Amino acid sequence: ADSCVLFVEAHGATMLFPGDIPARAELQLIASGSLPEQIDILVAAHHGSDTSSSQTFIDRVDPEHTVFTTKQANRFNHPSPRVLARYQKSGGALWDTGRHGAMCFRKRPARNLSATAMRIGYLPYWAK
């Protein structure tokens, strides 16, 4: 599969957006040597489907936060329970946009990265 992979480093935080790359492309990305030691924010490849997120890749990028871009009650059952279990094993925070809504990450000098889920604690105007 052809997919755009984007790595961003800003304000002391690292973010990786692997698009829809399959597990074999994850291994190629690791072999390229272009990844930093640890990723702060990872958007899970292919919405957390079984085609991506190999244990080797997860162990290598060691994400502090992983975001699964899904739709509430999606028909594909993303993220896959097997993929979710692999990320849970890594110990980082897991976020699902289908459940948590939009995500806001903030990095301030000399502070840890903070995450805010817009669907938790923020009610839309019609729900107030």
How does the language model describe each region?
Residues 72-128:
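Binuclear metal-ion centers of metallo-dependent hydrolases, dominated by the metallo-beta-lactamase
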Residues 1-79:
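Active-site-proximal loop/helix segments of hydrolase catalytic cores
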